[in-house]
């Protein structure tokens, strides 16, 4: 690790802002800046020269968190899977390119990455696809025949708790309505491969079409969702939500990381230089509204 004094960076060369179990990380074209407390360390990043990686950045890839907060980088619409090991970029898959992943929910569970829903080949989907690190391929998951059948969608909001994933809303399209917002809450159980509908959302939400980059889990029960100048806090155990308005300086960019009970975000100036700002989660959550009911109608007792 090479210590550096620089604390302001050029956003044009920034590929990802993320973290592992120990450090915040700024991943640039040819280097990784690791941040431990207030110390900055520069490590060279080895990337094999390839035209396929010209778009290796947060606009085109989702970060999926694995064991020990490891980062997997999954192409948003094709499903290619990369990771960084010993400061080298490694491709983990042998899969062919696919256009079925746009707007999908990518979730790590028991040494696999699962893709739920998404848009590809001019239509939304409700398929579940699993990436197996042993055979390095994506394979379709067979859903139990008695499972609830969810509507096709993209850009659903998700929250993982143990063997279950909650899915909140989403959007689909048809000839008559280009953006039909779905008002449902359901779960998927990894153990029996079943969806279950929990209830119908109140029709007063504005966080549809939310990119997965704007979803930050806080604990087993709660996640934050960022949309324009509003942050939503949803409690999936109590089926309540709270919100905080007037936070455009945090919500405007998808470069946000929660690390060690602190929310870090990039403050970008007019010259596209940025500094890392932070706020303690406890201080942030103190300013949220009082809890409101999430659902209008409940089908499944929690």
Q: Which residues fall in each region the model found?
A:
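Ankyrin-repeat TPLH-centered helix-turn motif and closely related helix/turn capping elements
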Residues: 263-272, 276
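Beta-propeller fold detector
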Residues: 42-51, 85-96, 137-145, 196-202, ...
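C-terminal single-pass membrane-anchor helix
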Residues: 1, 297-302
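Generic short beta-strand segments
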Residues: 170-172
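Beta-propeller blade signature
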Residues: 79-81, 125-137, 158, 179-194, ...
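Conserved short beta-strand element of beta-propeller blades
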Residues: 7-27, 32, 52-76, 81, ...
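Active-site/pore-lining binding-face segments in mid-to-C-terminal subdomains
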Residues: 182, 222-249, 260
């Amino acid at each position: 690790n090479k210590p550096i004094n620089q604390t302001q960076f050029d956003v044009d060369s920034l590929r990802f802002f993320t973290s592992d179990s120990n450090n915040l990380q700024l991943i640039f074209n040819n280097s990784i800046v690791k941040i431990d407390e207030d110390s900055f360390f520069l490590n060279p990043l080895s990337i094999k020269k390839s035209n396929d990686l010209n778009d290796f950045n947060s606009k085109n890839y989702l970060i999926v968190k694995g064991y020990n907060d490891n980062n997997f980088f999954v192409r948003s619409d094709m499903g290619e899977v990369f990771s960084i090991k010993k400061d080298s970029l490694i491709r983990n898959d042998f899969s062919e390119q696919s256009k079925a992943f746009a707007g999908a929910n990518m979730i790590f569970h028991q040494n696999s990455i699962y893709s739920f829903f998404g848009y590809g080949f001019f239509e939304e989907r409700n398929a579940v696809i699993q990436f197996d690190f042993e055979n390095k391929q994506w394979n379709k998951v067979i859903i139990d025949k008695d499972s609830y059948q969810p509507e096709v969608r993209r850009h659903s909001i998700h929250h993982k708790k143990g063997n279950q994933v909650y899915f909140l809303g989403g959007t689909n399209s048809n000839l008559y309505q280009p953006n039909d917002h779905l008002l449902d809450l359901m779960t998927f159980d990894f153990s029996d491969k079943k969806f279950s509908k929990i209830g119908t959302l109140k029709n007063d939400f504005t966080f549809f079409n939310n990119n997965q980059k704007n979803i930050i889990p806080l604990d087993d029960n709660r996640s934050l969702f960022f949309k324009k100048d509003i942050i939503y806090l949803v409690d999936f155990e109590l089926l309540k939500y709270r919100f905080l308005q007037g936070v455009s300086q945090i919500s405007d960019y998808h470069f946000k990381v929660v690390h060690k009970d602190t929310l870090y975000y990039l403050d970008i100036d007019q010259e596209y230089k940025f500094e890392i700002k932070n706020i303690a989660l406890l201080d942030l959550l103190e300013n949220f509204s009082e809890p409101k009911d999430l659902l209008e109608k409940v089908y499944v007792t929690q």
